[in-house]
């Protein structure tokens, strides 16, 4: 099972991206917002989910872990496959999608191509109680929304950059650590060393 890729964008279009990982090109189906944010030659870290059918093996990719979790959660609803789940994430950012499910907003969900009103209502019925709205309110990063940068976060990012990490990789690691640990923003000075240590561990693990 391929859970994550780190490599360089070889090509990108409106529905797919090819990422070169040590000379091997992985073709990925991705949400439109993620594809728009990518460009050729860019170094990326992509969270992946593999779908196996009778006709093909498809690798789906996401620029943040929350999008991948939402993608998998949507498929727990009977009748919702990877194509519909991807369509939803191409129409609504994960936080907006979670909020729409929590609020019972079937009109917002049915804007996704391939999903009708009844399908939207079924998703709401089956997932409404399992969507964690607290993660929305704390500003967990998505492909279109990142954790707001404050002085504490800037200190951590600058510290990682001084150790040789690229700014984009450093920022992504800090965002991920803050989201997964539940540390509140703005980042207090006392939490800066903790976040720095956790982010550095995450980056070293991803090498």
From Swiss-Prot:
UniProt region (Flexible linker), positions on chain: 143-153
Matching Gene3D superfamilies: 5' to 3' exonuclease, C-terminal subdomain, DNA helicase RuvA subunit, C-terminal domain, Nucleic acid-binding proteins
Annotated region described as Domain II, given as residue ranges: 64-142
UniProt-annotated stretches for the region Domain I: 1-63
Domain III: region residues: 153-207
Keyword DNA damage: yes
GO molecular function, one term: ATP binding
Alphabetical UniProt keywords: Cytoplasm, DNA damage, DNA recombination, DNA repair, DNA-binding
Keyword field contains Iron: no
Family annotation (InterPro entries): DNA_helicase_Holl-junc_RuvA_I, Hlx-hairpin-Hlx_DNA-bd_motif, NA-bd_OB-fold, RuvA, RuvA_2-like, RuvA_C, RuvA_C_sf
Location(s) in or outside the cell: Cytoplasm
Chief localization: cytoplasm
Gene Ontology, cellular component aspect: cytoplasm; Holliday junction helicase complex; Holliday junction resolvase complex
GO biological process, one term: DNA recombination
Domain comment in the entry: Has three domains with a flexible linker between the domains II and III and assumes an 'L' shape. Domain III is highly mobile and contacts RuvB.
Similarity remark: Belongs to the RuvA family.
Biological role stated in the UniProt entry: The RuvA-RuvB-RuvC complex processes Holliday junction (HJ) DNA during genetic recombination and DNA repair, while the RuvA-RuvB complex plays an important role in the rescue of blocked DNA replication forks via replication fork reversal (RFR). RuvA specifically binds to HJ cruciform DNA, conferring on it an open structure. The RuvB hexamer acts as an ATP-dependent pump, pulling dsDNA into and through the RuvAB complex. HJ branch migration allows RuvC to scan DNA until it finds its consensus sequence, where it cleaves and resolves the cruciform DNA.
NCBIfam families with a match to the protein in the record: ruvA
Assembly and interaction partners: Homotetramer. Forms an RuvA(8)-RuvB(12)-Holliday junction (HJ) complex. HJ DNA is sandwiched between 2 RuvA tetramers; dsDNA enters through RuvA and exits via RuvB. An RuvB hexamer assembles on each DNA strand where it exits the tetramer. Each RuvB hexamer is contacted by two RuvA subunits (via domain III) on 2 adjacent RuvB subunits; this complex drives branch migration. In the full resolvosome a probable DNA-RuvA(4)-RuvB(12)-RuvC(2) complex forms which resolves the HJ.
Annotated protein name in UniProt: Holliday junction branch migration complex subunit RuvA
Organism: Bifidobacterium animalis subsp. lactis (strain AD011)
Gene name of the record: ruvA
